[in-house]
Every structure is written in structure tokens, then in C-alpha cells.
Amino acid sequence: MANVVVVGAQWGDEGKGKIVDWLSERADVIARFQGGHNAGHTLVIDGTVYKLHALPSGVVRGGKLSVIGNGVVLDPWHLVAEIETVRAQGVEITPETLMIAENTPLILPIHGELDRAREEAASKGTKIGTTGRGIGPAYEDKVGRRSVRVADLADDATLEARVDRALQHHDPLRRGLGIEAVDRDGLIAQLKEIAPAILTYAAPVWKVLNEKRKAGHRILFEGAQGALLDIDFGTYPFVTSSNVIAGQAATGVGIGPGAIDYVLGIVKAYTTRVGEGPFPTELDDADGQRLGERGHEFGTTTGRKRRCGWFDAALVRQTCATSGVNGIALTKLDVLDGFETLKICVGYDLDGKVLDYLPTAADQQGRCAPIYEEMDGWSESTEGARSWADLPGNAVKYVRRIEELIQCPVALLSTSPERDDTILVTDPFAD
């Protein structure tokens, strides 16, 4: 049985939620392998809208095992609230349908406070544009070996020692930012109170997944955000604090890289970005406004308006390489309906030199001017198309040109938020 990794191939918000939901019907296990509740998935199922941030998309599908892996940083209070929200929508969540890796680091209130204080203190041009939910500081504590992890909640002495170690680092930082010292006893009390609700789902995920794999179960690895926000290969420092590319799927749940059979990159038919950082094809004109309005480009987590621009084939070709993408799912093609002319970025002009990739140096990224190729648009509607025959000729040409430029085939084509409005070209789960 094939196992599939789903990764965003742009700056996030590519429509991963719908694609993961579409694929999860045939998966046995759906595993989140990185990120926190700073990323959101919106699923539309039989007219019901589910907005998920911490929970894997598979929870809304009965009979599946959903997993939160060790590569995730988890806000336990947010998770409990999100579980209650989806339960109120009729979704059943039990220890048989949801597991949390015992070695998953927790996001504490002190992480969010530090995150927000840093953003407020940052001068113009140095703000990252975080969601303020503590994801970055939580990953810092993980690397600094001072995290409170899920397993630590089971023993009071261990929990108190972990908190004390974290506060040795945080209290001096807080003083420097003008924040009062942490209420140690209050924080420990909060953690002890939430512990039973989290420990109910705690499990040795690495062991469970390896057993599932040996038994021939299909595993769907669900990434958050997008490869251009990867801590190593994204537009640093305007990135997230974890590895987002497909290689993280193995590390983030504790399964070997040989378990990955297919990497599906999710790609929007145009480009969007939330927060600060370079964006070569960004449009500040009527076309950009039109893309944002037609695509409903507002963040699931923050409600922030997304920056919009033309499709950047050079960037997507780059992310397909760093994630080893076998095929892409192209989403939101219907947003382009009615544009007379479409543009695709095929490379960059950097001080008179033509590049076919975005350079690493931040100053060079800011000076890269897009080199565009123009294509005729289409006036007909593509919304709800479920076969190639339903698409206008120019829409098919646009998709084919994208395939040529990014050097990767289209495996799936999405033409609306509804899960069934999908054209299947190549089955990622095919053995």
C-alpha cells in the first residue's frame, strides 16, 4: 500500500485541507508532522464548514486514525477547545481515533506572550508577521532542550522540573522586554489541570505507525503551511520555525523515509502570501484585488488579508525539487475565470542577470524582478468541473504550461472548495 505526503508548495493557504480530506477517504491513518495551530484548514463537507488548526483533517472522517506527531508543537488548551468545537458539529473523537505522540512539545502561555512581545518591539522591516500564537518560541525551547512535552504531564516532579528549566530562560527574556516574571505555581497548576485531557490521547506514535505500515495500512502525512515558509529553504527570516518540506514527514512522526511512496505538492493557480517577506509576483493593482476577492483570500487563523500575485513557476519548480514532489494538486483554477490575460513568472531579473530560481540572500530576493510569460485567459466558468472535457481550451493550455515550467505533472485539479469538484489524473495512492 502506498503512503502519501501532502505538502504546500508555495507560502501556505494552497487548499491542502480539501485535498487531504479528499485523499483521507482512502487512507487508514492521517498524520500531522509539523507546525502548530498557526496554520488553518477549512473543510466543506455536505455543506458543513469545519475550521481546523491543531487537529489533523482526517478527524472529520469516521473510522480513521488521526495522529499528531512529535514534529508538531501543541497548545493543549487550544486542542481541547478545538475538540469540543468539532464534537459539537457531530464529529466523534476518542483515543481510538486520535493519538498524540508522547514526545510532542507543548506550547505554553509564556510562548504566546513572548511571541507577541517580540513582534510589538520589532521595528518596521524586522517584523516577521507571526500569528502571535507562540509557535516560534515553542520550537526554540524544543531545540534548547527545555520543552515541556506531553509525556512530562504524567509525573508531577518531572513536570515541575521541566517548567523550572524553561523559566530559567524565559524570565530574563521577559525582563528585557518589560514583561513581568512568570507565575510559576500558576503555570504548573494550569498544566496539571489540562494534563488528563491530553494524556487520554498520548501514545508511542512512532511504534503505532510502524506497526500500521507493516500491516499494509495506508498512511497520509499532512503538512501545514508551505515549503516557501520552511526554516531552511524558505524566504528566511520571514519563515515559520519548523521544516515544512516533505523530508520532515519521516522525522515528524518517527517513521523511516522509506515509508514515503509519493509526495503530492499543493499549488494554487496563482500566488498568495500572509505576513511579511519578499513576494516577486505580488500585485498591488486591480488584478491583485480581484484575485483576493474572488479567492476569498483571508487567513483561516488570523483573518488577515492575504497578499496576491501571479503564478510563480520558478518558485514552485524550486519547491518541487526540495520536497521531491512526484505530482501536484492544482487548486483554485476557477478564481482565474474571466481574466483576459494571465501572467506566469518564469524567472527573475537580478541586476541585469537572469535567474531561474530565487536566490538565498535576502537582499538579492528583494531585488528580483519577475520575468513574465503572458497567456490568453478564458471567459467560461471552470467552477465545479470534474473532467478535462468540462474545461475551456485556454484553461487546459494554462495547466499544461504550468506542468512544463515546473517540470512536474498535475495529479489532481481542484475547481471549487467542494471535495467532489476534483479532476483525478494520477492516483497518489496507486501502488
From Swiss-Prot:
Cofactor(s) in the UniProt record: Mg(2+)
Chain residues that bind GTP: 12-18, 40-42, 306, 332-334, 414-416
Cofactor info, note text: Binds 1 Mg(2+) ion per subunit.
Subcellular location: Cytoplasm
Residues given in the record as IMP binding sites: 13-16, 38-41, 131, 145, 225, 240, 304
GO terms, molecular function: adenylosuccinate synthase activity; GTP binding; magnesium ion binding
Family: Belongs to the adenylosuccinate synthetase family.
Name of the featured protein: Adenylosuccinate synthetase
Organism field: Dinoroseobacter shibae (strain DSM 16493 / NCIMB 14021 / DFL 12)
